[in-house]
Every structure is written in structure tokens, then in C-alpha cells.
Design a protein with these regions (language model features):
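Active-site/ligand-binding surface loops and adjacent short beta/alpha elements
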Residues: 87-93, 98-159
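Acidic-aromatic substrate-binding/catalytic surfaces of carbohydrate-active enzymes
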Residues: 1-19, 24-25
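Structural motif
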Residues: 12, 19, 49, 76-78, ...
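Extended, loop-rich substrate-binding clefts of extracytoplasmic carbohydrate-active enzymes
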Residues: 24-74
Length: 212
């Protein structure tokens, strides 16, 4: 998810006192960035890794590009996203939206969840709740995050500050690391100077333990 992650209220990005309208991909809001439907160019490939590059597309008013490196290691997959401003400064955010088959067990323990308002947008109000039957943003994992799928334990880690958990589907669960909360591109954005980058990583590891 680049150059924003999660929902953007009403699809409007406000930057330097100007409003920019984004496509309403999750009406009445924009969501999940502009590059999930973009064509990517392979810039490097090996037996165990690939690096992809895409521009942020015409739907993003500030230009810029993103690279995604995916590397298979002995016991985990390492993903690294790097979004780079072009000729103009811009707000930026990155994240991933992996879908997993419904886990038979999950250990997703966080310090707190950020409440949503009546429009489904994250607020700064915190509460303590389990990450079960939710579509919400969480902060500060209190233990390694893990899910068990088809008897294999997966451990999820990232240098992202926020995690969105979507657990409402009967067949799947999403555990999504993001560099900020939904709509943070307006509320408290990271601003990139021309040519500057924001880079984050996400690991999906398997322990080798088969859990029945």
C-alpha cells in the first residue's frame, strides 16, 4: 500500500493548504494507495529475490515512485518497500495488506487499539481489546505476532508502527503492517522532500513447528 495505507477520509489529501481528490476506491473513502493496480517493472532478479519498480500513477498528484524488494531466506520472506518523492515534496505512507487463509490459532496481542469514528476512520482514542472479529488499527505489539495456517506457525514482524487487523471474513484474516494509522497522511504525515525516501520492512517467518 503506497503512497498511503488504509482509508483516506473522503478521498481527500490536504497538503500545503490545498485539497487533492483521490479516487474513492472504498466509497466514501480512498484506500490502500495507488500502486496495487499499477504495472511494475522488474529491475533485479535472482534465484531467491526480486526487486520491482513502479511510478505512483496519475491518480497521485505529486509524482514519485516506489520500489518493492522481496527476498526468500531460509526461514522467512523479507519484504521491503521504499517510496521516493519525485520533483515535488509530498506526504507519504507505506504498508502491506497480506491475506491469510483463516488461522486455526492467532496470537495478536497489542497494547491498544485506536477507535474508529462513525465514518470508519481511525481516531487518536485508545482502548484495550482483543484483535478478534475486528477491522481496526492496533499499536505496540506486546509479544511476537503469530498465526497458524494449515498447521504451520507464521511469525510476523515489521519496523512499521501500526498494524491493521481485518478478521471479519469467515475464510481469511489480514494482518497489515503500516507506517502510520489510516488517514495519517492527513492527520500526522511524514513529509518527503524532493528525492527523499521512506523505507519499511516486513518479515513473514515460519518456525517449522507443525501445530495440530
Amino acid at each position: 500500500m503506497v503512497p498511503y495505507a488504509g482509508r483516506v477520509r473522503s478521498g481527500v489529501v490536504r497538503f500545503n493548504s490545498l485539497d487533492y481528490q483521490l479516487p474513492l476506491t472504498l466509497p466514501p473513502h480512498a484506500a490502500h494507495g495507488t500502486v496495487f493496480a499499477q504495472s511494475w517493472t522488474v529491475v533485479d532478479i535472482s534465484a531467491s529475490s526480486i526487486e520491482l519498480l513502479a511510478n505512483l500513477g496519475s491518480q497521485w498528484p505529486f509524482g514519485g515512485s516506489v520500489s518493492h524488494r522481496i527476498e526468500l531466506r531460509n526461514d522467512h520472506v523479507r519484504l521491503e518497500l521504499s517510496v521516493t518523492a519525485g520533483d515535488h515534496a509530498m506526504p507519504a505512507q507505506v504498508g502491506w495488506h497480506p491475506w491469510f487463509r483463516k488461522p486455526s490459532h492467532a496470537s495478536l496481542i497489542f497494547e491498544s487499539m485506536l477507535q474508529r469514528d462513525g465514518h470508519g476512520i481511525t481516531t487518536a482514542i485508545r482502548e484495550q481489546t482483543d484483535a478478534v472479529n475486528v477491522d481496526d488499527c492496533f499499536i505496540n505489539p506486546l509479544a511476537p505476532l503469530s498465526i497458524t495456517v494449515n498447521g504451520v506457525e507464521l511469525v510476523l514482524s515489521s519496523d512499521c508502527s501500526h498494524w491493521v487487523v481485518y478478521d471479519l471474513s469467515p475464510h481469511s484474516t489480514c494482518v497489515e503492517p503500516q507506517s502510520g494509522a489510516p488517514n495519517e497522511i492527513n492527520d500526522s504525515p511524514v513529509i518527503l522532500a524532493p528525492g527523499e525516501s521512506l523505507t519499511k520492512w516486513f518479515d513473514i517467518a515460519w518456525t517449522g513447528r507443525l501445530i495440530h
